Curated annotation (Swiss-Prot):
Family: Belongs to the eukaryotic ribosomal protein eS24 family.
GO molecular function: structural constituent of ribosome
GO BP annotations, alphabetical order: translation
Protein's name in the database: Small ribosomal subunit protein eS24
Keyword terms of this UniProt record: Ribonucleoprotein, Ribosomal protein
């Protein structure tokens, strides 16, 4: 899975960075959690304040376009983001421990 950043914009009014990106992959479309962890590594960001808002498959290609936001702090994120977006970006600690062991 390869991620390329299309745009990276700072939005001081909402206390966040807004990132548009494309994801190239070989098989099925990766999950939001997989894309989030890859973005954390590529952007050197804190996983607690990074939110993948959308991930849309490009018809006929093994690519997807996405939109992510990196907030300055968790308080700003909780104030602005909806509960559904926060739930789909939630990462359980047990899952991370399993990945770290492998």
């Amino acid at each position: 899975m390869d991620i390329s950043i299309i745009s990276d914009r700072n939005n001081p009014l909402l206390q966040r960075r807004e990132i548009k990106f494309t994801v190239s992959f070989d098989a099925a479309t990766p999950s939001i959690k997989d894309v989030k962890m890859k973005l954390v590594a590529v952007l050197n960001a804190n996983k607690q304040v990074l939110v993948v808002d959308t991930l849309d498959q490009i018809f006929g290609k093994l690519e997807a376009e996405g939109y992510a936001k990196i907030y300055n702090d968790e308080k700003a994120m909780a104030t602005i983001e909806t509960k559904s977006v926060l739930e789909k970006n939630k990462i359980e600690e047990e899952a991370e421990a399993e990945v770290a062991e492998e």
